[in-house]
């Protein structure tokens, strides 16, 4: 019985990092497809169009709920923090899985 538990633990140790890496790659792809055109593929922002998300203090401190709200509902010009960027952020419709992936990347991998 103990041997079986050890084998199961070793298999899990080998499989789960690969699953996490694959999910991370999927999250990056979701970000690039959904956000990259305006915010840059690496989150660096585009002058006059959209702010940088990498290193962005609000993104780092915002709750997942706040990020989800902005991503799915957008932001009108008067609600924006960046007055030098005239275009409002559009609302985005997507699956919960895609939304969670983008938020995970915004809060994690993008900030590294």
Q: In which residue ranges do the predicted regions lie?
A:
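Bacterial N-terminal signal peptides that target proteins for export
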Residues: 1-9
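N-terminal signal peptide c-region/cleavage motif recognized by signal peptidases
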Residues: 15-19
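Sequence/structural segment immediately N-terminal to covalent heme-attachment motifs in c-type
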Residues: 23-44, 68-69
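Soluble non-cytosolic domains of exported or imported proteins
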Residues: 25, 61-62, 93-97
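Charged catalytic carboxylate motif
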Residues: 30, 66, 98-101
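Gly/Gly-Pro-rich "capping" loops immediately C-terminal to redox-active cysteine motifs
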Residues: 44-72
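Axial heme c-ligation environment in periplasmic c-type cytochrome domains
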Residues: 47-54, 73-101, 106-112
């Amino acid at each position: 019985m103990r041997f079986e538990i050890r084998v199961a633990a070793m298999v899990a140790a080998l499989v789960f990092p690969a699953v996490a890496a694959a999910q991370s790659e999927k999250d990056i792809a979701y970000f690039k497809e959904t956000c990259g055109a305006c915010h840059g593929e690496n989150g660096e922002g585009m002058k006059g169009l959209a702010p940088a998300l990498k290193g962005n203090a609000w993104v780092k401190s915002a709750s997942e709920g706040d990020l989800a709200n902005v991503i799915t509902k957008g932001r009108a010009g008067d609600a924006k923090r960046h007055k030098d960027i005239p275009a409002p952020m559009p609302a985005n419709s997507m699956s919960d899985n895609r939304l969670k992936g983008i938020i995970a990347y915004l809060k994690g991998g993008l900030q590294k």
